[in-house]
Amino acid sequence: MIASVRGARPAVRTRWAVLLLLLHVSETSVWCADKVTGTLLVKDALTGLNQSVAIEAKLIRKGLLSDVGLGGEPLELVQKGEIVAKAMTGGDGRAVFQFTPNMRGMATLTVRVGESPRVDRAEAMANLAVWERRTPILAVEVAALMEEATVSSPLPLLPLGEKTERSPLPAAADELSKLTQFYYNVIYITIAESDRSDGFMTNEQIRAWLKTHKFPPGHILVLSGGPDALGRQLDELHTGGWKTLKFGIGRSKAFAEAFLQRRLEVVIVPEPTKGELPRKAKVAKDWKEVRKKL
């Protein structure tokens, strides 16, 4: 009897060991099956025909206090259903694709998460402007397209979001569409100092706002770095060969001054309050007058 009890103890221990092992494997399998939900953000890009361009993307996990970059994840750049480039996210969630377009115009690109055991499938879209460098370019301050904000700023930030989204100014979309239909390419410019995603989120919000309100497609530039950011960007564009950018349509005094300091023409719309108009800047009381000023 004692011998049989002693003989049973190893068997019981074995069963417990097997059971614990199965539970561990089960828990591990469940943990591995739970993937993180990521959010993809992509910035617009500008280039010429058959010229390589960097497409910037960012994969994040949204949090209550801050967003966390998801590193080490495979991303794919897709055009018309075909994978044209691949990249891996760094520790901050950023990835950069190199892509050479072979057709002029506005191209829609998709960035998506590739095969990953850690992150669910996600995708985001962006616009790639492939322009002829001889075509005139019109720079438009996004704030000049919107109804007046409740908070003033030297360079108006983009006030988008569920609680603060602004309506477009009357006739702005129609008039800008007429300007871009046969003659101008358009660059939309805004300042986003408080964007914790380094401009990625603001770029996406502007793109959605412009599409919702039927503005013509164009290249979106999100700037940060204070009042001098626009001037530096204009210099970079000219140095990069985009010398046909000679006209601007803006709302703020700082926007107008950046153009005038470089001997570029600028139209302010709508008509500003007294004292806010820089010398040599043209004024349009509304968007229906803008074409007469260019």
What are the language-model segments listed below?
Residues 1-12:
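N-terminal secretory signal peptides that target proteins for export/translocation
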Residues 14-17, 131:
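Residue-level detector of transmembrane insertion/anchoring sites
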Residues 17-27:
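Bacterial N-terminal signal peptides
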Residues 28-32:
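Sec/Tat signal peptide C-region and signal peptidase I cleavage site
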Residues 33-133:
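Beta-strand-enriched, solvent-exposed domains that form extended recognition/catalytic surfaces
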Residues 35-39, 90-95, 120-233:
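Alpha-helical substrate-recognition element adjacent to the catalytic core
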Residues 68-70, 181-182, 216, 241-243:
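Short helix-terminating capping/connector loops at secondary-structure junctions
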Residues 197-294:
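C-terminal cap/substrate-recognition subdomain and adjoining C-terminal extension
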